Amino acid sequence: MNILINFIIFIIVLFLYLHITFQLKINNDLEILEIDEPTKGQLEEICDLRQPILFTFNNKIIDIINFEKISNEYSAFDIKIKNKEEKEDNELYLPLSFKEGVILLENDKNKKYISENNKDFLEETSLIKIFNNSDLFLRPHFVSNCFYDLLLGYPESYTNFKYDIYYRNYFLVTEGKVIIRLTPPKNTKYLNLIKNYEILEYKSDLDIWNVQKKYINDYEKIKCLDIELAKGQIIYIPAYWFYSIKYIEKSIICNFKYSTFMNTFAILPEYIMQIFQNNNTKKQLTDIKNVIQNPLSNNIDISFNIN
């Protein structure tokens, strides 16, 4: 009887070990795979290589998610504005109506504001149903969680250099044009990683588009790959690959992230750290909407104040 129990335990441990190892697998080859129109099976196989993949995504969501339609129908709903120059301790988002947010982004002289983390906006406007009905081709097998986001940006603005921990991570351009700069996980040691467990964000303090003097030596040790995406193109970025999105034109990006049951188990320590962080940290965002009463001023500067 004891032998049988020990054997069952061994099989369970072996099963978990193999699946967790598979989930945490990385690939450091600095190249991107381009496919015209992959089948569902081909996409799954190639994604498991853990290399970036670029392909065309012909889907109705491309004709629905654009500035004109959202401005006409959902301009009163709040999106979240982020100052990408803020440090970890002030990593919060400012809610503004879509109309106000677009004005801010358009007139931001310093190009330091972007819009992301807009799950609430998608839910309140019911646009999340469009995402949910358009991503069956992208969803991996045994998916446990789907995370959707909407990113907005104007020319010359860009996101932080960061990575994601989920099993699948796709970015679809539905309007405009962007450049994505990528580097594989092996370069993490040169990127001065900042972990914000409260929102599960893992970003580099290095500005990959305008490298600070103090990081020049580290930057010279890494190699990056730039890829341009236009409307209708989608890219898969593997977990732990650093990426930054720079907007060439006024653009909207749909972000699809997926976690499977085994992926959730593999990154369980990150969720535990998030619980601890949220229990020990209390932050309050002050109401500063009055700061943008004159959005067309020469120099727009919104501060994220935390008490």
Predicted segments with their positions:
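N-terminal accessory scaffold of Fe(II)-dependent oxygenases
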Residues: 1-234, 242-307
